[in-house]
Amino acid sequence: MTHIVTDTPLWKKLSDHHWEVVGTHLRELFDTDPDRGVDLIVTAADLYIDYSKHRVTRETMGLLVDLARAAGVERHREAMFTGAHINTSEDRAVLHTALRANPERELIVDGQDVVGDVHTVLRRMGEFTDRVRSGAWRGATGERIRTVVNIGIGGSDLGPAMAYRALRHYVDGPEVRFVSNIDPADLLSNLTDLDPRTTLFVVVSKTFSTLETMTNASAARRWITEALGEHAVPRHFVAVSTDEERVTAFGITARNIFGFWEWVGGRYSVGSAAGLSVMIAIGRERFTEFLGGMRAIDEHFRTTPLESNAPVILGMLGVWYSSFFGADARAVLPYAHDLARFPAYLQQLTMESNGKSVRTDGTPVGTFTGEIFWGEPGTNGQHAFHQLLHQGTHLIPVDFLGFAEPIEDLPTLDGIGSVHDVLTANLFAQSKVLAFGKNADEVAADGTPSALVPHKVMSGNRPSTTILGAKLTPSTLGQLIALYEHQVFVQGIVWGIDSFDQWGVELGKTSALELGPALWDLDGAAYVGDSSTTGLIRTYRLARGERRCLP
């Protein structure tokens, strides 16, 4: 039976404490504890994390850490790092941390030398990367590869696409494009200006049977063979998969298969062979730096006491707002345009992991779980949705991400200052205004007409974290990824759920396969068991000019 922490006296104590804190404004918290902006910070590797603008006291943080400890975060953390089968519903180890482990580390799990296997694949990836980047690997007509197209979906797309966008200044290899959606527009728009002779496809699918991925891969194969012939397939396709039989049947040679393992889920796989396209783009040395950034946070998470452990603190703040305040969402706002896809990446990482309503033992959870992650880069969001963050009725904690040193910069209008400084001033201003706001007296003191005062009041007391890195590099990107990965783990342990399965995505897949014939089998009946779906199919078929066998 799962240890149900929500039924413990400690949970009750936190619930009672919440009612003591909920009526206290952040202005008051800073007035009574002026050093909190110095003390309520934590550093992890190259990241400076300020959590002082949260609706917590020092007592709150002590209780949250006590809750993490009581839930068994330390014990389960060690179980994860050492290969225990903590993914209980699938009876699997959870070893994404092994993907970035030092090669000298020994880890035997289920009779396999996990770290040795990882570095064998990394070496093969590096050798292949060097061949593509140097021009030693060429297409069927002898042309050098100029574009790599990554075909995958979910973790086989979101992580690599995010990392490629984030690290664009470090790209000195072939251009990489990403195709994920089964909508033909995705593949066709990416192929329209490409030359088959200079294009290499990386097909990423653990089973090599994922519907969307294999539909796109098959279409890409036709594109190659129609232009270059069947013999060209082995020179224009490689695979990231565990199913050699299916891959070789597709026409890819076995030596061009890069494997990964059941113990790494898709949303945790960007540091595995699923990141091959990123390695080709930035080179094996920078990819190693990327893995090193993840490893630095792994080591911080594994060895740092809970009281100063960044993933524990941030994960428990998420529990605080979700389970005690009833907050549904967290906004992640990177003030770095190259991190534009980072919120979308976090959506899968966090919501597929912790969007669960039963505990590991199958019993219903007793609290809200999971957070809805969303966001856009600053300052764009300030002209879109920040209005709701500042004056809306929803409580939405915010994570601000920023960097001290820009990779590229421009002068201000007067030619004196730095536009990056202006960007960062906006980041700090948003954090400050969310926390402290502007009350009616302050608005009126500006000469605002009395009728307009209520409209201009900013209530403040809106919580946020600010995470600052020195510069956006492969290492700091890896650090950010691991920082959020381990937050997910901490929350899952406290809520008693399995953060590493995703059964909720399966029924939709099977239902789509069942419904498909009603759309394209024009001699079959369109009725599928309920009037709504039947009506949608009928409307769809009529719009496509097909009237046979309609109810």
From Swiss-Prot:
Family the UniProt entry places it in: Belongs to the GPI family.
Pathway: Carbohydrate biosynthesis; gluconeogenesis; Carbohydrate degradation; glycolysis; D-glyceraldehyde 3-phosphate and glycerone phosphate from D-glucose: step 2/4
Protein name: Glucose-6-phosphate isomerase 2
Organism: Rhodococcus jostii (strain RHA1)
Predominant location category: cytoplasm
Gene: pgi2
Pfam family, one: PGI
Reaction it catalyzes: alpha-D-glucose 6-phosphate = beta-D-fructose 6-phosphate
Enzyme class: isomerase
